[in-house]
């Protein structure tokens, strides 16, 4: 069921849900009178508009203007579902286009509170073509580096979902809302209703978070802080190393190379990204916040673990289940995390975490983090989506590499593994913002390399990176299992090897 507090909130009630006492300044475009009964001369259309206006107090199905959410100014759009089902007609298009232009002129983010049944049939093709106007206006905002957030209410269907809703950079949904291109009266009679719900769209990777009404203002505020707009943000600092559970650290061990080392005192990385750390607790689940505090060096602020003596040892340490994983690194690095969920093509990969986060000092950083599992095509598509969003908004990117490789099962091939990996390589190659990479575990061939930043990759002492897993290399060379260790040494996959080969800038102890 829809969220009781906001399922059928009016347009202005929905705005007040975000702005509270901060207020809202309404804007209106120059009026354009419609011909009698609209462009189609639809009998009774004028009377229906008059009844809708008397019932809602609105002149159209959209209200827009400027407001403050938390501490962030923005342009707000809110649909009035009580006015002809929140449908889009010519005058609605005028208001939507004007709202996007207002955001562009004032360089403000745009937040849309959507509740609509789609295009207004009483205006026919004149109504339908308003979707093209919205798409064009949204594209201009994207080109200007201005973020768009959609909050989809109940119901959000048809062209409104396919433009203002699903076309936003971040899509939040209220619990239980009906969300889908096909409305309830036009979908197949036996269609699964879950697929058309906020929760179903979240499961399919089309919605970033389902947020209760009483958490919406705080969540949108955090997103506005993270998304900006921003200018000239520094590179993401290299995360500090985290100790392996139950392991005893050994005092300062060098990398054995002049190519770039970081001492336990934390003097900074060879990439010039700086050294900064945070510690805290929290969960990656949902759109909530996670506390973090403190500072330290990229080397962990103290003693460091010894480097692996052999290739076999490096692989064993990277595969050690006690080794800290992406979740621990992200919780330590960020004060607040805001997940981006799904690939927008109908799938998700729980083994890859994406989103934007705020550090303890307020700096926003986008993150893409592998969790130690084979990365699926949906994961690579979500990664590319995150990197391109960050690049467009001027937000630096942090990637955490940890995978035995890309998923290689038949389903992954059918889902376009090759194209998805290629797209991730391209997203990083084209990024204008700085990308920082830390290899925290397994670096399994191209499936890992797709997320690595050329010339700004760092490694932990518990990591390795290889063109192929040593077991597979030995098998290809028809060597017995007893020679796997020697093969690992030949591959030169240890952290210190990666620095000496010029792949990694430094070892984070």
What is the predicted function of each stretch?
Residues 84-91, 123-126, 373-378, 410-418:
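Flexible beta-alpha connector loops of hexameric P-loop NTPases
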Residues 50-51, 56-66, 77-88, 373:
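Glycine-rich, flexible beta-strand/loop modules in the N-terminal catalytic cores of phosphate-handling
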Residues 247-299, 310:
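Long, intrinsically disordered low-complexity tandem-repeat segments
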Residues 67-80, 95-120, 356-371, 379-408:
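A structural preference for short, pocket-lining loop segments at secondary-structure junctions
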Residues 117-235, 404-509:
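Conserved catalytic cores of soluble enzyme domains
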Residues 56-61, 87-98, 342-351, 375-385:
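Glycine-rich anion/phosphate-binding loops
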Residues 139-143, 370-397, 415, 426-433, ...:
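A structural preference for long, well-packed, hydrophobic secondary-structure segments
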Residues 1-37, 182-252, 294-349, 454, ...:
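Amphipathic alpha-helical segments at domain termini/boundaries
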């Amino acid at each position: 069921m829809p969220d009781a507090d906001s399922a059928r909130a009016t347009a202005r009630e929905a705005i007040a849900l975000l702005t509270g006492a901060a207020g809202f300044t309404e804007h209106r475009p120059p009026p354009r009178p419609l011909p009698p009964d609209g462009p189609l001369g639809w009998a009774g259309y004028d009377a229906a508009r008059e009844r809708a206006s008397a019932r809602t107090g609105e002149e159209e199905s959209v209200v827009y203007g400027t407001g403050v959410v938390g501490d962030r100014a923005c342009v707000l759009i809110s649909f009035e579902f009580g006015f002809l089902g929140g449908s889009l007609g010519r005058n609605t298009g005028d208001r939507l286009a004007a709202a996007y232009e207002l955001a562009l002129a004032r360089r403000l983010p745009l937040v849309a509170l959507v509740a609509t049944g789609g295009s207004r049939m009483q205006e026919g093709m004149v109504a339908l073509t308003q979707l093209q106007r919205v798409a064009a206006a949204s594209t201009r905002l994207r080109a200007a580096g201005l973020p768009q957030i959609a909050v989809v209410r109940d119901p959000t269907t048809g062209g409104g979902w396919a433009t203002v809703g699903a076309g936003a950079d971040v899509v939040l949904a209220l619990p239980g809302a009906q969300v889908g291109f096909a409305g309830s009266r036009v979908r197949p009679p036996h269609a699964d209703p879950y697929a058309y719900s906020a929760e179903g769209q979240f499961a399919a990777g089309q919605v970033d978070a389902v947020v209760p009404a009483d958490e919406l203002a705080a969540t949108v505020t955090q997103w506005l802080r993270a998304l900006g707009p921003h200018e000239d943000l520094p590179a993401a600092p290299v995360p500090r190393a985290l100790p392996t559970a139950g392991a005893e650290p050994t005092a300062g061990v060098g990398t054995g190379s002049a190519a770039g080392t970081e001492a336990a005192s934390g003097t900074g990385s060879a990439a010039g990204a700086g050294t900064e750390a945070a510690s805290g607790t929290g969960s990656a689940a949902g759109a909530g916040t996670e506390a973090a505090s403190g500072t330290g060096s990229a080397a962990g602020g103290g003693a460091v673990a010894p480097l692996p003596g052999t290739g076999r040892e490096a692989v064993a340490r990277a595969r050690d289940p006690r080794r800290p994983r992406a979740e621990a690194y992200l919780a330590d690095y960020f004060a607040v995390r805001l997940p981006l969920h799904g690939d927008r093509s109908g799938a998700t990969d729980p083994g890859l975490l994406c989103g934007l986060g705020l550090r303890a000092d307020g700096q926003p950083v986008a993150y893409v983090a592998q969790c130690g599992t084979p990365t699926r095509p949906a994961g690579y598509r979500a990664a590319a989506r995150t990197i391109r969003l960050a690049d467009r908004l001027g937000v630096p990117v942090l990637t955490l590499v940890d995978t035995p490789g890309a998923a290689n099962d038949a389903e992954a091939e059918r889902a376009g593994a090759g194209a998805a990996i290629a797209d991730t390589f391209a997203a990083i190659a084209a990024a204008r913002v700085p990308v920082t990479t830390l290899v925290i575990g397994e670096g399994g061939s191209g499936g890992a390399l797709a997320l690595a930043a050329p010339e700004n990759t760092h490694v932990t002492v518990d990591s390795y990176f290889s063109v192929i897993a040593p077991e597979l290399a030995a098998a290809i060379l028809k060597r017995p299992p007893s020679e796997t260790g020697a093969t690992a040494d030949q591959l030169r996959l240890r952290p210190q090897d990666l620095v000496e080969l010029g792949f990694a800038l430094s070892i984070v102890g």
